[in-house]
Amino acid sequence: MKDTIRQLIQQALTRLTDDGVLPAGLTPAIQVENTKDKSHGDFASNIAMMLAKPAGLKPRQLAEKLVAALPADASVSKVEIAGPGFLNFFQNSDALARRLEVALADERLGVRKHGDLQRVVVDLSSPNLAKEMHVGHLRSTIIGDAVARVLEFLGDVVIRQNHVGDWGTQFGMLLAHLEEKPASAESELADLEQFYRAAKKRFDESEAFADRARELVVRLQAGEPECLRLWQRFNAISLSHCQEVYERLGVRLTPDDIRGESAYNDELPGIVQALRDKGLLTESEGAQCVFLDEFRNAEGNPLPVIVQKAGGGYLYATTDLASMRYRSQVLKADRVLYFVDQRQALHFQMTFAVARRAGFVRDDTALEHMGFGTMNGADGRPFKTRDGGTVKLIDLLDEAEQRAYALVKGKNPELPEEELRHIARAVGIGAVKYADLSKHRTSDYSFNFELMLSFEGNTAPYLLYAYTRVASVFRKLGREIDEIDGSPAPEAGQELALAARLAQFGEVLGNVAEKGLPHLLCAYLYDLAGLFSSFYENCPILTADTPARQQSRLLLAALTGRTLRQGLELLGLEPLERM
């Protein structure tokens, strides 16, 4: 609907330009927003205030001319001028009903992407295989997964890339420890964190062990078969730990999505040579660097992107440049989205700039850093165990399920044990994910089990329960929610408000895909659940006073249920038929 209004405004602007009211050459970004107060219409635009100055008119005068120049459209019942010159558009209720009818008849709820379909690479999760996945990996994994799901739903081709840290000097230390204890390695590797700490302790305390670790790094980098065998064994065990976490979280990541740092090893000398051939390299204290004028420190000195150390070793930037070239030139990506901590913003700004300057990425490939904030404890500090250690992600999920189990059993002690466990898993894991996804991506947030497992407020339990309320209506009828289709005829205020919000699902998903912000979908679903609750309490469905009204309200309920279910699934949550 917003696109329709933008087109109508653009036609009016063209007409006023042709009539000499507006000067030629204006290309304003036409903004159309949803109104909060529906007595002021469904949509509003400030275009008259934006263009009043170049038109040499007062905003309200220009607004009057715009309204007069607007073409008639069946989806708009009327346009009013409010305040200093806002244009308020009222949606035609018949046109709204037709949009809902289309949504009900379509398994994709009438949602289509506006604009061309694209190939999108999503870089997400990317844990360091030297350690077990911890809470710091949660945000990249689930935010990236949610955005990837939305992109796919809109029709884009999505290529997930799990850029795991499977290479580097720390692996020499781990291989040395693995080599020392071949018999007990399997059992010790069951706890990667403990294995890493033990190897680090040996490295710090034994000069001979440290020398052996450094030697193994050199041999590993040289491709010595026995070192590669130990390295591959360690990585296989570490990756199996990661896959267990992904399956518990319900994210769409598989071993096929892994392309770690080591995959680019053979390309790194060529990356450095290509930068040299382009005249971009400068030697600084023995290291090979790229200096770009647009990146300077507080003293005004250029900042380096170091691509090769004085000793010949390569850095993260070198590997990132190789991956950017691969994703643009080989995977043919139109967009590459990097779901990586906000603290890496400068690193990505600089490597993106180098990649473009060097010609590693096509001009039409968009490189986008989707940075995120930190997950903190209740005290506002980085989330840690009581003894100050790192919290394993699998331990966090275990506790979430245990707490959810106690909560669900307390409310429904009569449920069979298997069903209790299933509900607890969906509620517990869903609560952890939703508490994160519902926050703005770039914000820090405090982790709090009590708040996230509450049935009140913008939480997973509240939304999961909202869906079960809709499902219960159709269970009482003995009908499936997906069987219901037709054209609703919303009349009452609560019906119209619910209908208008349902029609905005596609627009919300478009914004999530464009901006990489899942919290927009969370806010929409929370609002939708609240509107349904008001509708349910004020507009009887099964006891409606006429068959036509009952059918119309059933259609609204069905579309609400399907939209909630689809939205929850796009966030990576499991909808439940009953709780």
Swiss-Prot record:
SUPFAM superfamilies: Anticodon-binding domain of a subclass of class I aminoacyl-tRNA synthetases, Arginyl-tRNA synthetase (ArgRS), N-terminal 'additional' domain, Nucleotidylyl transferase. This is Arginine--tRNA ligase. A motif ('HIGH' region) lies at residues 127-137. PANTHER family: ARGININE--TRNA LIGASE, CYTOPLASMIC, ARGINYL-TRNA SYNTHETASE. Its EC number is 6.1.1.19. It comes from the Bacteria. It is found in: Cytoplasm. The keyword DNA damage does not apply. One of its GO terms (biological process) is arginyl-tRNA aminoacylation. Monomer. GO terms for cellular component: cytoplasm. Belongs to the class-I aminoacyl-tRNA synthetase family. Transmembrane segments: none annotated. It holds the Pfam family Arg_tRNA_synt_N. Keywords: Aminoacyl-tRNA synthetase, ATP-binding, Cytoplasm, Ligase, Nucleotide-binding, Protein biosynthesis. NCBIfam families: argS. One of its GO terms (molecular function) is ATP binding. It comes from Azotobacter vinelandii (strain DJ / ATCC BAA-1303). Its main location: cytoplasm. It catalyses: tRNA(Arg) + L-arginine + ATP = L-arginyl-tRNA(Arg) + AMP + diphosphate.
